[in-house]
């Protein structure tokens, strides 16, 4: 089991939590981004830099994902793709993507894209909060308690 991170838009506080979890649980955490990422020295943490381009990092994450892995992403289509491969998907706010909710999330995303294309201001997500970080930490700990190798 490994943790793959869609790192381009992942909040720094979440990356720090993942770095601590990697060392504590001795699991591989791989950050994938189209820019250079500084990571702490650890045999459990690595960064993969991909070329710039639309969805290049997402494609690499899908390629690397295996059944049982955990993918951290806010990207709904990426979450759908890794769920199809049997991986788990968690967003940086601690919300799970699942077979039960992914179609609705994709539909909502498509509708919001259509509204934006029509010139309607749909706003954006709320700023990342301390509560979001706590929710993420709780969900990550629960997942690792069930799935990390012992």
Swiss-Prot record:
Stated family: Belongs to the UPF0178 family.
InterPro entries, sorted: UPF0178
Protein name: UPF0178 protein Bcen2424_1660
Organism: Burkholderia cenocepacia (strain HI2424)
Signal peptide feature range: none
TM segment ranges: none
Source taxon at top rank: Bacteria
């Amino acid at each position: 089991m490994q943790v793959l991170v869609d790192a381009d838009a992942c909040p720094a506080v979440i990356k720090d939590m993942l770095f601590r979890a990697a060392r504590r649980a001795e699991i591989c955490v791989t950050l994938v981004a189209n820019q250079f990422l500084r990571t702490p020295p650890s045999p459990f943490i690595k960064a993969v830099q991909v070329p710039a381009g639309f969805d290049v990092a997402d494609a690499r994450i899908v390629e690397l994902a295996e059944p049982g892995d955990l993918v951290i992403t806010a990207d709904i289509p990426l979450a759908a793709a890794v769920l199809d491969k049997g991986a788990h998907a968690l967003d940086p706010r601690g919300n799970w993507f699942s077979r039960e909710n992914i179609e609705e999330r994709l539909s909502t995303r498509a509708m919001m894209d259509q509204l934006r294309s029509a010139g309607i201001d749909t706003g954006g997500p709320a700023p990342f909060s301390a509560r979001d970080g706590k929710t993420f930490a709780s969900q990550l700990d629960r997942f690792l308690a069930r799935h990390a190798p012992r």
